[in-house]
Amino acid sequence: MPNIEIKARCNDLKKARATAEKIQTAYLVVLHQVDTYFSTKAGRLKLREINDKSAQLIPYVKGYQLAPMKSDYAIMLVENPTLVKDLFNTLLGIEFVVDKNREVFLFENVRIHLDEVVNLGTFIEFEAVCADNSEQEHRKQETKVANLMKIFN
């Protein structure tokens, strides 16, 4: 499943929250997420534990750059995250763990994440879900993300 995304440091989450409210986003939820990243030869593989209640295995591939980028990913529900984490640690090794509190807003098809990450700081992320994998759709979503970057400064 493709999306267009960008993540950046955000020194003022209060201001970002006010901007999200101003443009009339839908406020979805506050989440506590612990992402365990496993060592891979290509792309990334993470186990995301959400609010100590559910978990997802998320493999993805993206080109890292300082602009909106395409990411191809899949989300697989995990029933036993402890077992999965132990098995993937044995098979691949753990690269790092990211512990964050995330506020999620929705503007049209773009998820806006306001993140407080333990030991790393505060961030904002825009994820525009693509309707298909065409170049035209990618450009359309890149434009949406670029516009939000301007709005949120």
Language-model features and meaning:
Residues 135-153:
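Mixed-charge, glycine-accented linear interaction segment located at domain edges/termini
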Residues 1-110, 152:
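N-terminal strand-loop-strand beta-hairpin
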Residues 96-139:
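Conserved, surface-exposed functional patches that form binding/active-site neighborhoods
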